[in-house]
From Swiss-Prot:
This protein's UniProt keywords: Chloroplast, Plastid, Ribonucleoprotein, Ribosomal protein, RNA-binding, rRNA-binding
Gene3D superfamilies associated with the record: Ribosomal protein S18 (4.10.640.10)
Keyword RNA-binding (UniProt): yes
Subunit and interaction comment: Part of the 30S ribosomal subunit.
InterPro entries in the cross-refs: Ribosomal_bS18, Ribosomal_bS18_CS, Ribosomal_bS18_sf
GO molecular-function term, one example from the UniProt record: small ribosomal subunit rRNA binding
NCBIfam families in the record: S18 (TIGR00165)
GO cellular component: chloroplast; ribonucleoprotein complex; ribosome
Encoding gene per record: rps18
This protein's name: Small ribosomal subunit protein bS18c
Amino acid sequence: MNKKIKIPKDSKAINYKTTDLIREFISDRGKIIPQRITKSTRKKHKLIEKAIKQARLIGLMPFKQKNW
């Protein structure tokens, strides 16, 4: 679970369109990985959470993983 995730310094790079980036912040079961594990700041983690939730609502990402 302790995988190294590279967080971009530019906060504009974190949005719902960058699904490749925000998929790294989701666990195998489809849950958002906590801030203490990803080592991201509070501000960046809020942006990541918001982007994941927006992508799920639009349909770019699934709410649950299929194999669970």
